[in-house]
Amino acid sequence: MRTIYLIRHGKPEFPDEQKYCIGRTDLPLSEEGRTQIRALGETFAGRRIEKIYTSPLKRCRESAAILQEVIDRSIPIEVMDGLAEIDMGEWDGHSFDEIREQFPAEYAARGADMYDFRPPQGESFADCARRARTTWNELRMKSRGDILVIGHAGWFRTLICGWEKRKKAELLQIPFGYGQVYEKKDFVFDALISAAGRSSRMGDFKPLMKLGTQTVLEREIQTLRACGVHEITIITGRRAEDIRAAAVGTGIHFIHNPAYAETKMFDSVCLGLSYYKEKRKTAGKETLDGIFFFPVDVPLFTPFTLEYEKYRFAEGDGDVYLPEYEKTPGHPLLIRADVIEKLLQHDGTMGLKGACEQPEIRRIPLDVPDPGCAFDADTQEEFQKLRDWERKRPIPDREECERLLAWFHTPEATVRHSRAVAELTVELADRVLKHRSETYVEMTYKSPPIDKHKIYAAALLHDIAKAYPEHPETGAGWLRLLGHTGIADIVADHMDLPEEKLGYLNESLIVYLADKQVQGERRVTIEERFAAKREKFKDNPEALAGVERRYQLAKRAEALL
């Protein structure tokens, strides 16, 4: 395991003693800031740092240069634009007194919704968080050892807020002073794909068959990359050159099994494991913690399965993690790198399954809510089933929704509420569709299609993460990882509908409104729903203001129906 050090730049040179909004304002370090960073650099003496990544802003680049000079001048520095601080738009460079005076309405709106508020021509913290997650994954995959990341408090806080499962409202409470360090432990995972089979029963070449617009192999590589897998090793056999040509991109390694026609899959697996054994020996054990393994004909596992395996891997209770869907074995396996040598000592009986069942190997079966992990294809008929499932996956059916509610241990009261909301969404949708048919409304962006199956599924799962902080976005995140992309945004919107979706009838608005009209399992009016909350927060002016804001939004949505 390696450590990634998040380091806030030193104190900048401010124009005066006022408090300024300096998101992208390019201030240099102050003398105090340079002293802070130099002292920090001394604490890294003797540590092996592979690389320094820095924001393009001057205060960070200067901090990075000082750290390089103090720690080791041979450490490379890379500037990443994605590390830049949150863009405060027209507010940038102004004092907060000036902002309050020039933008009174916007400043008040910011106070009511700090996380999602977007200053004129700028970013919200939600925008910054999305950019931060993308950049974080990029920089993680650029290196394998300990690294320094020099950046900004706002950018770092959006990541830490998610890592520590904090509420959005707590974002600015996360301490991150000038020159402060946050240590993030990080496992390094690679992947091994066995693509040396002959595809004899398929009558085609499985790695290069199309699933939608992508080949099987392209889909698998995309999923691995989305989960921060570093190097992908592909064992080739038949049509090796075609696979090399198709698997484009950095961090892809090929090992050819010249005897693929006479050997079994375990022989190909051993070629890959032997490669990783030698790699750890030369580069150091800390450069590789685990290996995802799967045969190339299992392309529909989702990022959720990989992330869940990584989560369980971090608990340290197993050596091989084996996903399964409703008792059906699936892929990828996650193999702890420390047991590579033991697996290689196996005599080959029962292949990799037999190697993993050695008594010294701790096997951990993992039930996952991902049918795709258990779908493989050896014939054209089986491959067509993969295509059918891939087409249907964005919108889960009722049976799959109920399975998800059970897997995530959603409380029974919440499940009953969700079913009641789902039934109401269908009634509201029928009302909208009936009105459209009677008035011959043309489909436009202001009157988009209403899919009853989609809103029913979204309503059934809207509170799937109710027991977790920021449950709308948490639940939507789970659904995106599972490939249920058709309903994820609706789930994310169900508590606070974005302003841009309040001007016309749409699927998010219908689910949002149905949720506001069901209390427990009982249907209520908007007024009834908010009366209890007004009473609850009557002595808390700030919370009461939030209740009133949500009430007004709900009434605007109701007026559209």
Segment roles from a protein language model:
Residues 39-107:
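Phosphate-coordination/substrate-recognition cap region in phosphate-metabolizing enzymes
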Residues 190-237:
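N-terminal glycine-rich phosphate-binding loop and ensuing alpha1 helix
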Residues 261-341:
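Conserved beta-loop-beta/alpha segment of the NTase-like Rossmann-fold superfamily
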Residues 341, 347-399:
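Conserved alpha/beta core of the MobA/IspD/sugar-nucleotide pyrophosphorylase nucleotidyltransferase superfamily
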Residues 388-471, 481, 522:
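Acidic/His-rich, divalent-metal-binding segments that scaffold phosphate/diphosphate chemistry
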